[in-house]
Amino acid sequence: MNQEVYDLVIIGAGPAGLAAAVYAKRSGLNVIIVEKQFPGGKIALTSNVENYLGINSIPGPELAYKMYEQVLNLNVSIIYEAADEISLKEKYKKIKLTTQTLITKTVIIATGTENRRLNILGELEFENKGISYCAICDGPLYKNKAVSVIGSGNSAVEEAIYLATIAKEVHLIANKPQFKAEQQLVQIANNTPNIKIYYNKQTFEFFGHQFLEGLKFRDLITNEVTTLNIEANFTFIGLLPSRINTNNLCIFNEVNGFITTDKNMQTSVCGIFAAGDIVDKNVRQIATATNDGVIAALYAKEYITRNNW
């Protein structure tokens, strides 16, 4: 075969993919990363990280860069393209990118997740015109303005706290009677003067002219409708798997779209592994993502050794 054959191609440069790259490279594998956006994954879009062992508190972009820098120092290359398709080519795996095709012995799918949308009136119309899914990216545009955050988990509460340092007022809207977020975060939000919290509220419409001007929500108990005048909304209501076309390999779970693996992070196809938030599991944290990446890399190495490559 004239084309270069990699030992391992990692799809995704979030914590799982970067951790896998470190262990794969240190074990002697010829490894390359494919990333369609930027290194660090969702960490790079997080205002602050306070639950990663060994680091009390660090801005998300800084932690993402430290991970990326460690991989660069090992001379691991990153191709900035989308991975469109994975297929089998004899005993190898073929990965079709936007402008080229890679041949590899093993693959780690670490594509992560995408933001879930509300699918309500006005959402698509005002996306990038006031509706955002990244507070650290777009929050500074709304200094001393009124903004809203929709969601009840850690991400929603964390980003509301961050936005409160920028915006004049932050309306934090949950469709549940209480937050799912850590109590420490909820306490901080409750004690932040310019955060107003709403429980049992279902947002059903965004409105405006050229840009977002407000939203409407309904009280799930009284059915009362309230209109809020805001200039930006940040939605954090969960995640959807970021999938790749795998033809008929049946790697992705057709029910929920995530990937089921064994304890070694191997999928239903030998030599194809998965790591991080794309894996079908209950807990998705930075620590669990890096853990998956390490295991996947070590067993990719074991797979190659076992097959006498």
Curated annotation (Swiss-Prot):
| A Gene Ontology cellular-component term | cytoplasm
* Keyword Flavoprotein belongs to the record: yes
List its EC numbers.
Answer: 1.8.1.9
Q: What is its main location?
A: cytoplasm
Q: Where, per UniProt, does this protein localize?
A: Cytoplasm
For this UniProt entry, the molecular function terms from Gene Ontology, in alphabetical order, are: thioredoxin-disulfide reductase (NADPH) activity
Q: Which SUPFAM superfamilies match?
A: FAD/NAD(P)-binding domain (SSF51905)
- Reactions catalysed, as given in the entry: [thioredoxin]-dithiol + NADP(+) = [thioredoxin]-disulfide + NADPH + H(+)
* Cysteine pairings via disulfide bonds: 134-137
UniProt: FAD binding residues: 35-42, 277-286
User: Which family, according to the similarity comment?
Assistant: Belongs to the class-II pyridine nucleotide-disulfide oxidoreductase family.
What name is this protein filed under?
Answer: Thioredoxin reductase
Q: Which organism is it from?
A: Ureaplasma parvum serovar 3 (strain ATCC 700970)
